[in-house]
Amino acid sequence: DRRQELSNENVLVKVSRRQLEELSKNAKSSSRRSVSSESGPFNLRSEDPLYSNNSGKFFELTPEKNQQLQDLDLFVNSVDLKEGSLLLPNYNSRALLVLVLVVNEGKGDFELVGQRNENQGKEN
């Protein structure tokens, strides 16, 4: 049954912090578009927030603004919310992978929200 095949394609898997650390030790960009690329951490909050109001601040770094993100074809967002504020999810339908880092009381957890096959959604 085709529906059964499709439902088995995008399985969410919980990954432990130790597994993430192990994977990130040797992580490199697979892109060959750029010969030189800065490496190392960057401070997302060193720029002005894209949006800011009484409820908090929304920071975004795009591939156009950061060479490392160009190599990975990646967008990075960060939100500082004040207590009692609410952020509704923003979903990019072209994203191949949506990964969320949830920080609660100083402890961070990665959550894989969705994954899409590159060919999914393309017209034949």
Curated annotation (Swiss-Prot):
The primary location reported for this protein is other
Its family remark reads: Belongs to the 7S seed storage protein family.
Going by the UniProt record, its keywords in alphabetical order are: Glycoprotein, Seed storage protein, Storage protein, Vacuole
Q: Which Pfam families match?
A: Cupin_1
Please give the residues the UniProt entry marks as glycosylated. Answer: 53
Sequence intervals crossing the membrane: none
**What GO cellular component term, any one, is given?**
vacuole
What's the name of the protein?
A: Vicilin, 14 kDa component
Where found, per UniProt?
A: Vacuole, Aleurone grain; Vacuole
Q: Which organism is it from?
A: Pisum sativum
